[in-house]
């Protein structure tokens, strides 16, 4: 009996360790043919907002849903690395009905980084994040749909989804889920801060 309880506990802990948010079943788009993850494709097709060392040649792309608490964790974990890297945060809308309006508010904000920090504090405080109008300009709604379609074209099943070139190997790396700062630095090939 103890072995069965231990096994079940282990399975539950493993599921929690994945640290990502998945789309609602009803909202999950049909899976198109999976394409190879490419920094160049993301740079050309996705739209988001940049934070960090904006002039850096090293860009880290992060697909996120505003309603995903794991994305908020990654937002905080990435902050110490922003002195050396440029992060482009690419909003998608798939966790719940608040996702797309909040993504639109972040994309159109005069200072998206400041609004993102405010939003993440509200979300972490259990307040659901920032208030956002459900009236979204068609071009902004299309941008979010394009970002979401690109994410799913890579076969991603949860956010945050990171795409970058490892600084040490030059290889494209990608992964789902949040990381602590040191693990994120290692994943990106950066010396720990």
Regions found by a protein language model. Give the residues of each.
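A short, hydrophobic beta-strand/beta-hairpin element that forms part of a small beta-sheet core
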Residues: 160-174
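Extracytoplasmic thiol/disulfide redox context detector
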Residues: 2-5, 12-99, 135-158, 166, ...
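Hydrophobic transmembrane alpha-helix bundles
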Residues: 124-130, 155-163
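Conserved segment of the thioredoxin-like fold in thiol-based oxidoreductases
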Residues: 97-142
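Charge-rich, low-complexity amphipathic helices
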Residues: 90, 128-129, 173, 184
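Short acidic-hydrophobic, aromatic-tinged amphipathic segments that line or gate anion-handling sites
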Residues: 106, 175-176
């Amino acid at each position: 009996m103890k072995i069965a309880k231990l096994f079940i506990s282990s399975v539950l802990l493993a599921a929690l360790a994945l640290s990502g948010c998945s789309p609602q079943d009803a909202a999950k788009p049909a899976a198109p043919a999976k394409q190879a993850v490419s920094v160049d494709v993301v740079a050309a097709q996705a739209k988001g907002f940049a934070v960090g060392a904006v002039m850096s040649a090293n860009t880290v792309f992060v697909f996120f849903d505003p309603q995903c608490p794991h994305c908020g964790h990654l937002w905080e974990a990435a902050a110490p690395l922003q002195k050396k890297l440029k992060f482009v945060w690419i909003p998608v809308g798939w966790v719940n009905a608040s996702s797309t309006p909040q993504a639109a508010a972040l994309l159109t904000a005069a200072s998206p980084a400041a609004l993102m920090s405010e939003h993440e504090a509200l979300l972490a405080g259990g307040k659901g994040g920032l208030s956002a109008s459900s009236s979204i300009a068609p071009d902004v709604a299309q941008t979010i749909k394009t970002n979401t379609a690109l994410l799913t074209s890579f076969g991603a099943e949860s956010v945050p989804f990171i795409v970058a070139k490892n600084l040490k190997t030059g290889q494209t790396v990608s992964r789902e889920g949040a990381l602590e700062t040191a693990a994120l630095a290692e994943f990106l090939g950066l010396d720990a801060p």
